[in-house]
């Protein structure tokens, strides 16, 4: 029984680590730091201050509209581990579309690249990340009020530099 539990733990750990991503913390509220919660919608356990400069967070899981993060860094600091992992709402997390070739890039209705395909010509814009899987990101682009899946090759998660 212990071996089975250990194997399940190892399999779950591998899956979780394989799905980890880095997102940019871009909180529009510049009056106070961003809340990190013990559970989605729960008590605030710590804050991350990204008012002076953007920060990146290391995401290890997703639950509903929240991402579970375990560390963060800013342009002027190395990675800092949180005392305990905590949840941040998707509305303050995202990524840049870095379509520097300025081509009409394909976007999809699902992460398996099936469903209606559309081509959008957008570049150097911040989008909120709603989900991620199969090297695809489900994003919300506020300016167009559109949600779509996009391949990671069109995205940049660098808060302090540009991506090529």
Predicted regions and their residues:
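Sec-dependent N-terminal signal peptides
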Residues: 4-13
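Short N-terminal segments immediately surrounding and downstream of signal-peptide cleavage
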Residues: 19-37
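Short alpha-helix capping/helix-loop boundary micro-motifs
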Residues: 38-45, 110-116
């Amino acid at each position: 029984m212990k071996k089975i539990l250990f194997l399940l733990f190892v399999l779950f750990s591998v899956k979780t680590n394989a799905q980890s991503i880095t997102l940019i913390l871009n909180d529009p509220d510049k009056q106070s730091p961003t809340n990190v919660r013990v559970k989605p919608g729960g008590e605030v356990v710590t804050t991350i201050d990204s008012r002076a400069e953007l920060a990146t967070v290391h995401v290890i899981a997703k639950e509903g509209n929240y991402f579970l993060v375990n560390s963060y860094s800013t342009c002027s600091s190395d990675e800092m581990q949180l005392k305990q992992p905590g949840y941040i709402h998707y509305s303050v997390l995202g990524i840049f579309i870095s379509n520097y070739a300025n081509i009409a890039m394909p976007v999809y209705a699902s992460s398996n690249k099936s469903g209606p395909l559309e081509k959008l010509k957008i570049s150097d814009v911040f989008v909120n990340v709603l989900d991620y899987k199969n090297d695809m990101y489900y994003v919300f682009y506020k300016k167009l009020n559109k949600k779509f899946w996009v391949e990671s090759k069109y995205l940049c998660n660098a808060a302090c530099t540009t991506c090529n």
